[in-house]
């Protein structure tokens, strides 16, 4: 299969074949990262702008390192240092960036759909590094890559996503990707944080941790955002941890080869106990490692269409 998109905006729009192509390409780039010399000339002569209008550490650093390993020229921009603070519109800002003959814009924004809006209006490639509560496609892809690497495939696999599904772009990207590849998906958390409409697309919804994880092959625990407590979505962090935090006694009742995942940053002893995060079933740090290969793959594939 050939990649034909100049943008990566979300997993909702991708076919199973396109997702698999990204994962296969990432597997090749992971081999590059394991060599002594980790750099390849795939994006030499191309310029990538990392435009993060919303704060980020892991995703921004991962993208920047991926770009360096592909030999791209890199420009890092943040909203605080841009003309957005002077009243310039987002579209005018990115139009001016494009006028400098850049090839790719990697963007994170707090507004849902911001990347889709600018991608329709730019000739350069746009990669979504997270938009509002909509999607975080490269996080979804690195989670899929990690699952495939550990489990061999997705058909019939039981994957449970626990936490704040309502506000999570990570959850949405995971759900779309997992369903397209044939996994069975369960989402669980407080009723205020788990929309029932997911049932309409074949996702199992429950509000009990034990029910969600007993038959799971993979458990992906999402960060609880403390700011949601002030909005009345749940009584308190302690109560959330009591009902939905994954602890060692529960692990003993689960499948012995279950994968424990988390997109980070972790709130230890809230979403999961420290001993679970650091335990033998945890692949959390492997997710971080795999994110580099996945982002190299995405940059490489999208850049190939921009060149054309």
Predicted regions: what they are:
Residues 1-65:
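Positively charged, low-complexity intrinsically disordered leader regions
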Residues 37-145, 268:
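Phosphate/diphosphate ligand-binding glycine-rich loop within oxidoreductases
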Residues 70, 121-123, 181, 199-201, ...:
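Short, structured coil segments at secondary-structure junctions
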């Amino acid at each position: 299969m050939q990649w034909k998109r100049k943008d990566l905006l979300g997993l909702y729009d991708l076919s199973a074949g396109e997702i698999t192509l990204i994962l296969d390409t990432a597997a090749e780039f992971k081999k590059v990262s394991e060599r002594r010399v980790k750099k390849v000339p795939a994006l030499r002569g191309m310029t990538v702008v990392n435009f993060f209008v919303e704060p980020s550490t892991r995703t921004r650093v991962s993208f920047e390192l991926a770009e360096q390993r592909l030999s791209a020229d890199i420009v890092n921009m943040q909203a605080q240092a841009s003309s957005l603070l002077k009243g310039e519109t987002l579209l005018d800002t990115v139009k001016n960036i494009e006028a400098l003959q850049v090839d790719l814009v990697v963007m994170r924004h707090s507004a849902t759909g911001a990347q889709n809006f600018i991608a329709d209006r730019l000739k350069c490639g746009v990669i979504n590094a997270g938009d509002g509560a909509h999607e975080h496609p490269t996080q979804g892809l690195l989670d899929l890559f990690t699952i495939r690497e550990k489990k061999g495939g997705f058909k019939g696999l039981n994957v449970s996503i626990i936490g704040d599904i309502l506000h999570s772009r990570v959850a949405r990207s995971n759900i779309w990707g997992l369903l397209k590849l044939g996994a069975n998906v369960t989402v669980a958390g407080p009723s205020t944080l788990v929309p029932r409409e997911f049932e309409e697309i074949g996702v199992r919804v429950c509000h009990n941790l034990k029910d969600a994880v007993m038959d799971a092959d993979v458990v992906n625990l999402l960060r609880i955002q403390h700011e949601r407590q002030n909005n009345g979505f749940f009584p308190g962090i302690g109560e959330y941890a009591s009902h939905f935090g994954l602890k060692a006694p529960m692990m003993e009742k689960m499948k012995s080869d279950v994968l424990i995942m988390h997109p980070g940053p972790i709130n230890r002893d809230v979403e999961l106990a420290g001993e679970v995060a650091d335990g033998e079933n945890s692949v959390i740090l492997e997710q971080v490692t795999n994110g580099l290969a996945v982002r190299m793959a995405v940059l490489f594939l999208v850049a190939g269409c921009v060149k054309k």
